[in-house]
A protein has these predicted regions:
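Alpha-helical transmembrane segments and immediately membrane-proximal extracytoplasmic
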Residues: 1-194, 198-203
Length: 203
């Protein structure tokens, strides 16, 4: 607990947006106030520099992995839903900022929406959930087709490497995951100790 708490404290000191669920960070990015994320950070003096924004947000996404690991290791609950939105929003924003830097003007907000939908669809293995949820939360129905395409691509990509979502992964590893396949479900619920006959006559 001490090591995890110390590690988390150092990360939050260097990258303040890692503190909390991340909804304030998402709101800042969607409202065009990304420079507020630099408050009390070591890159505060570069908060209006485009390259600094890309670097800072990329580091936040990278160290979010360690922050979540430290939280879980210290006995806390890092969650799945909020971190998915957090990382997806920042990733989409970074891609948009990078395209703007190289001379391709694109709206940051739209890319942030697509990033959230894509990451949520991949993590939860639920492309429709990612599409409709982001559209409902943000009112971005004009981007419905974009969100749908992003979600489907994310889902088709992740199932190649991981068959189960994070919610079902632990159950699958324990062999306790119930599926729509009736025979497999029955075999999953069946305890072998109750089936194997042990009272045998010795000849």
């Amino acid at each position: 607990i001490l090591v995890g708490g110390l590690m988390l404290g150092v990360l939050i000191f260097l990258f303040p947006p890692l503190y909390g669920e991340g909804y304030d960070t998402i709101n800042a990015l969607l409202t065009g106030e990304c420079y507020n994320l630099f408050n009390q950070s070591f890159l505060y003096n570069y908060r209006f520099d485009a390259w600094a924004i890309v670097l800072y947000l990329s580091l936040i996404v990278f160290f979010k992995i360690f922050a979540s690991a430290a939280t879980n290791g210290a006995g806390g609950t890092g969650g799945i839903f909020a971190p998915s939105l957090f990382v997806g929003c920042i990733t989409g924003f970074v891609v948009a900022e990078g395209l703007n830097i190289v001379g391709l003007p694109v709206p940051h907000q739209n890319f942030a929406f697509a990033g959230m939908a894509g990451l949520m669809s991949g993590v939860m293995h639920a492309p429709l959930t990612g599409t409709f949820l982001i559209a409902e939360l943000t009112g971005g129905y004009d981007l419905f087709m974009t969100l749908m395409i992003t979600s489907v691509i994310a889902y088709l990509t992740i199932i190649v490497f991981e068959r189960h979502s994070l919610y079902a992964m632990r159950l699958a590893q324990k062999g306790e995951l119930l599926t729509h396949h009736k025979d497999r479900a029955v075999l999953t619920l069946m305890k072998m100790d109750n089936v194997i006959e042990t009272d045998l006559a010795i000849v």
